[in-house]
Amino acid sequence: MTKITKTLFAASLLLISYVLFRLVDYSKVMLGHPLSNIYHDIHGYTPQLFFLKVCGFHQSCPYWYNGIKTFIATPPAWYFFAYPFYIITNNLFIAFYITAILIFLFSFLAIYYIGKIKLKSRLQRLAFFAFVFGNNVTMLTLRMDRLPELFAWFFLIISFFIILHYKDREIAWPFYLLAPMYALTILSYHGVGILLSFIFLGLFLVKLIENKTEAIKVALTGILGFGLTAFWSIPLLLEARNLFISQTSLGAEAWWDFAGNYLHFTPIAIIILPLGFFIIFYLYLKTNEKTNDLIFIAPSFLLIVLFMSGLIKFIPIIKTIFSNIFFIFIIILISYYLLNIKFGKLNTNFAKLASVLIIVLTIGTIAISMYNTPLYDTATPEQRNVAELLNYVDEKFIIAGGLREIKSNHHAIYAYAPIYNNLTTAGGQYPALKDFQYLEDLDALHGNFSVSCEVFSSFSDKLNVKQYIAYGKNCDWLSYCGAKLDKTIGKACLYSK
């Protein structure tokens, strides 16, 4: 067993152990809806799974924002996957955790069995899974409850290995499985689907140079894959201009966005991960004799350069992809090409250095993850007091003024209310579902009461708000503006207009 082999085994063991530790900790999600604002996207996911059951797909649903059309802007694949578990268990949070476990299990099996077409040894496949799923970014993605995104990575990885397999051989019928894989990636998390398109484009360029007939097959497969998303993507495109999703500036960050805070993980990763990819890919080319790798990687290479430079922020559609998604994409590429470097062709001292770096980076990513990514939290007594007030709500309500004092926010309560109390609200957790003007009016009610009582009352009438939940000093402001006190629990209060 060579030194690099021993190193890969040790690194894989450490990272997979860390994955298991995080999955065990994540089982706390089954205890019920978290009410904090710390690293939680579950506030947007479990209510929509509930909406799928009670309202249906692409149907009017009254619970959020004075009524929404379900899944008009939400990729639905994970919800369809989770729905049977929700029906069987009759518990959103048990179903949520089951799908988390299955995504990691299915990803491991896909890498182990499908990955062997390009990663020949078991250790290579084990290491690939460990590097892709045991790193700081993926563990943060799990901690933030982003199961639809993790579901998309599962399909991207399958697609990646299929594409790599046919890059160097004639296309046969199994290749066309890429069409549903591409569709499922988009329908799970469209940002990941966009990145898969760049790998697809690399294959198209290779085939265009080598065999134009096969290039046409690749293009038609991609078109078919996107076509399979038509039941969701066409309604989205038709409605997009009326939704906040078309006006949001959220997405990829540039290193200059962190002026004065360059020691933050994100700006460091924006520079270090692309540099790592460039170095690893160079070493891969140096130790392998394939002629089409540069052509294949060119679209992804360009994308990574744009991301590293910050120019990605100026490119339509792509600029809406969050930085963490780019990070995982780059980690997948780094992992694959690292595991295919023929270290025997490199200087012995370099191979020793590589072994040391792999161990240092493995320990480093676990340490960073433990430091930056807190363990899963449960509701505090103060947060439960706010949620308990929902038992006394009998009209359309909003959270007035915010809940930062108790490390919660209106999103958490708007997610909790329909699931546990069957309540409707003028607010919601998924702003992409409404237009910008509506959200601006809503923010006036969510804000720290920077408007007059008259303006506050006017916005309440406009959004059909009849009751307010508030906390601490915000309760005093509601009283000052003439609202009627209905109930207090601790420092939490419920007022009527």
What kind of region is each of these model predictions?
Residues 8, 123-126, 171-174, 214-219, ...:
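Membrane-interfacial loop-to-transmembrane alpha-helix junctions, especially the N-terminal start
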Residues 157-174:
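Membrane-interface transmembrane helices that cradle and orient dolichyl/undecaprenyl
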Residues 109, 171, 246, 290, ...:
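Extracytoplasmic
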Residues 219-226, 339-367:
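Signature aromatic-anchored transmembrane alpha helix within multi-pass, membrane-resident enzymes
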Residues 30-44, 66-70, 137-151, 242-267, ...:
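Membrane-helix boundary/interfacial segments in multi-pass membrane proteins
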